[in-house]
Amino acid sequence: MAEKYILALDQGTTSSRAIIFNQAGETVCMVNQEFPQLYPEPGWVEHDPVDIIESQISVAKKAIEIASINPDQIAAIGVTNQRETTIVWDKNTSKPVYNAIVWQCRRTASMCDQFKKLGYEDTIRKKTGLVLDAYFSATKLKWILDNVEGARQKAERGELLFGTVDSWLIWNLTGGKIHATDYSNASRTMLFNIHSLNWDEELLELFNIPEQMLPDVLPSSTVYGYTHKEIFGVEIPICGNAGDQQAALFGQICCEPGMVKNTYGTGCFILMNTGNKIVDSKHGLLTTIGWVLNDKSMCYALEGSVFSAGATVQWLRDGLKIVEKASDTEYLAKSVKDSAGVYFVPAFVGLGAPYWDMYARGTIIGITRGCTREHIVRAALESIAYQTRDVVEVMSEESGIKLHCLRVDGGASANDFLMQFQADILGVPVERPTVSETTALGAAYLAGLAVGYWKDHSEIKKQWRLDRRFEPQMDPETREELYKKWKNAVTRSLGWVEK
C-alpha cells in the first residue's frame, strides 16, 4: 500500500503555502505563492478573496505534483490561517460582496472608540477575552454590512455568509457544502463567548449582526467535510483547523499548562497554554481559545503581542541602511562584548503588551562618542528579547505559572545571538526545534489526529525534535541590572506623541 501523507494549507497575510508532512512529522515538500496586498486608503488593508482561494489551491496542487505522490495518498488536509481577517460572500453564488478586510486594517478604529465611549469595553473583554479593537472581526463585519449596498438586507434574508479565512477556504474546498470554523478562530471575532462557547447574542445585537450568517463552530481536530472531487480528482477529508498562532502552539507540542512559545516574525506572538483555565488579564494580554480536540478537551491560552521584532531589523536594513541583510545582524552583534550602554526601544507604531501605548515612539538612548553601528545593531536585537520578557513576566504573574522554558520559531529564531540573549535575559532555557514550520505542522497534527494517522498526543510529542537548546549564561545580578535599565529606557519613550 502506498505511503500516506498529511497536507497542511497555511494561508498567511502575504502568501499562501502548502506543506506536505510524512508520518515522522518531517517536511516532504513546501510550495509558497505570494498574492497582492491592497491599500485603497491610508490605514486600510484588503485582499481579494478570490486571490486567497486560487493561490491556496494552486500551491496545494503544485506540492502534490512536486512530492511525486497521488492525491489519494493524502490522508487528510489541515487548515491554518491569518486570523481575524473578515470575508462576506453570497450563499448561492459563492461570490464575495466585498474584499477581505485584513486584520491590520484600521478603518473601524473610530467605530471602536464610539463603543468605548458607550462603556462596552469591559463587557466585551469579559465575554470574549479580547480588547475592544479594530484588529478583530466584529467591527469589520459591521462595516461591510453598513457600507456595501444591499448587504444588510441580503444578510437579514439569510443570503450572505460571514467567515474568517479558514471558513472561506473550507467553503470553497468543499464546493459550498460546509460553512464552519473552529473554536480558536471563532474566539478572535469579538462575537464569541469563550465561557459558554457560543456566538454571544448580546454582542450580535450590539454590533447588529444577523446570527444566520455565522459559521458553525467545530473542534479544531475533527472531520469538517471533503474536498470537491473536481479540485484534486479525489475527495480528501478536511480534518484540522486552527488560527495560525494557536496552530504554532500545537505544532510546538505546548500541550501542558504553563508551556510557552514565541513566534519571532515582523512582531512577536507569545502564547502560554493555560489548560482548561480562563485567565482574565488585567494588563492587556488577550485570553483566547488555543484549541478544542474531538474529545472536547479544551485548551485556553494567554496571548501577548510585540509590535516590532523583525520590523526593527528591517528598519536597520532599509531605513538606516547600516546592514545589507538581516542575517548580518548576528555577527555584528557578536563582534562587540555588549551594547556599550545603548538601549533601543523600537516603538515605531507605539508599544503593545503590556504597555499598550499607541503614543509611544522609538528611541535610541545611552549613546556616547564611543557608540558604533555594532552597538546599535546589538541594542536592536536585545530589544526583541527585552520586549519578550515584558510579556512573559505578566503572563507568569497573571497565570500563577512560572516559566521553565521558552520554545521558539519564526524567522528571527535562526539568529543564535538573539536566542542566547533571550535565554540570558529570561533566565530560562530557550528551545529551537528542527522543524521551523510549526504553524503548518500544528495544522497537520490536528488533521492527522482526527483520522487516526497519528494515534494520540503521546505519539506526536515524541516527534518534537530539538535543533538547539540555549542555556542562560548570564549571572542574575547582571540580568536584573540590564532589565532595570531597559524599563527605564521604555519610560522615556512612553506618551511621546501629544494626544
Swiss-Prot record:
Cellular component, GO annotation: cytosol
- Which keywords does this Swiss-Prot/TrEMBL entry list? ATP-binding, Glycerol metabolism, Kinase, Nucleotide-binding, Transferase
Under the heading Gene3D superfamilies, the entry gives:
3.30.420.40
**Annotated positions binding ATP:** T13, T14, S15, T266, G310, Q314, G411
Binding residues for glycerol: R83, E84, Y135, D244, Q245
Q: What is the activity regulation entry? A: Inhibited by fructose 1,6-bisphosphate (FBP).
Is Transferase one of the keywords UniProt gives this record?
yes
Q: Which SUPFAM superfamilies match?
A: Actin-like ATPase domain
Which residues are recorded as binding sn-glycerol 3-phosphate? T13, R83, E84, Y135, D244
Q: Known EC number(s)?
A: 2.7.1.30
Q: Which reaction does it catalyse?
A: glycerol + ATP = sn-glycerol 3-phosphate + ADP + H(+)
Q: Which domain of life is it from?
A: Bacteria
Q: Which InterPro entries match?
A: ATPase_NBD, Carb_kinase_FGGY, Carb_kinase_FGGY_CS, FGGY_C, FGGY_N, Glycerol_kin
Q: Which GO terms describe its molecular function?
A: ATP binding; glycerol kinase activity
As recorded in UniProt, coiled-coil segments are none
Which residues does ADP bind? Answer: T13, R17, T266, G310, G411, N415
Q: What class of enzyme is it?
A: transferase
Which PANTHER family has this protein been placed in? GLYCEROL KINASE, SUGAR KINASE
The record's similarity note reads:
Belongs to the FGGY kinase family.
Q: What does this protein do?
A: Key enzyme in the regulation of glycerol uptake and metabolism. Catalyzes the phosphorylation of glycerol to yield sn-glycerol 3-phosphate.
List the protein's name: Glycerol kinase
Q: Which organism is it from?
A: Pseudothermotoga lettingae (strain ATCC BAA-301 / DSM 14385 / NBRC 107922 / TMO) (Thermotoga lettingae)
